[in-house]
Amino acid sequence: MTSTSGSGRDFGELRRVVVKVGSGIIAPAGRLDPPVIERIAQDVTTLRDKGLEVVLVVSGAVAAGYLGMGSDRLPVSVVERQAAAAVGQYQLMTMFASVFEERATVVAQLLMMQDDIEDRRRFLSARHTLQELLSRGIL
């Protein structure tokens, strides 16, 4: 398959792309930026419409969650960061699920840590899960 982006870029035989979005993009100043997330959803949808499988990797749960915890500063301790991530992860998934639902796209999340990559059994399990999601058209 040959695909091109809106900029005319030729994707050649590319089948799958990984889009990485960091906290500085989606949660500047500790708040999720809905217009930015909307734009990401549109761009991802455009890629999918061109026949590409898209894996969206999003960081930013800590940045999105610390204000929701009532804090006015980024968390420093491991416990604070984990609590902020727990709050922020829900906010991220809620917002992404909403913007992609408008585009008839189901989203899923895989939460992974370094140990999941280093342990062969856990890595293979995550890979098989991702392959199953992609085969069903789930983002």
At which residue positions do the language-model features occur?
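Nucleotide/pyrophosphate-binding catalytic subdomain
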Residues: 1-139
